[in-house]
Amino acid sequence: RGNRKNHILPLVQNLTTLNQEIAMDPYTLGVFLGDGAVISTRIIMETLDWNNIQNLIPYRLVKETITGKNMHLSTRRYQGLREHLNLLLDYTYHISPSGRRTKKFIKRIPNSIYMASFQDRLNCLKGLMDTDGTVDKRRGRCEVGFSDIDLATDTIKLLSTLGIKSSLRPKQIKGAKTHYRMQFNTHLSVFNLDRKRELQHRSPKPEYVNRRYLSKIDEVGVGFCKKLTVQNDEAGYLVGHSLTVAKQTIT
């Protein structure tokens, strides 16, 4: 009827995994991916926010520096954080003007997170949301954004493993990198920070969070292709970062 979307695809509900162990605390990993410095591994947050979640970081605080116009920013360095990141993240090298070579971590969600337990995946997401996430005050909708498309698509996949449907919207910032913003609603609490958690609306309508609507079908032409065989009772499989449910239709 008009522009109404009336074709629905099933949505993955909490991906069942092997509960793989993670080489570091998943919440701290999420916090680093959000507000961590890729060379020094220091993490910068507002001081009041640190006071709210500091007990959730299981590593020993080595140094803290208070900065900012109103002394509102806290930069913290934790013992052992670099060594744990070495086990999970890829890296390149930064060459200083003096020729000194320093390891520079690449911010990506490691594959082991997707195979971790539900709680570990949720804790990693909470770290990302406490640092880079926001809440629409009027609607209570969650948002999170990055200037790196790889980290953005990684986050979409992480959300999908938790049964959360999200949308990705790129926005070109004048004189800066393109910003990729994801929006989603969920019944899950995705924040540890009190000021954000209190704003989240956790009773969205089921039709918004439990359904994926098919909005467009494009003809791709005729050509040779390989037959895909799926060995499970339902002949189903998951496609892309959003883990869209697809089924084998040709036997």
Region spans (language model):
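Intein-associated homing endonuclease modules of the LAGLIDADG/DOD-type, together
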Residues: 1-175, 207-251
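Long beta-strand-rich cores associated with HINT superfamily self-processing modules
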Residues: 5, 171, 187-209
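Helix N-cap motif at beta-to-alpha junctions
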Residues: 148-150, 186-189
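C-terminal edge-of-domain segments
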Residues: 179-186
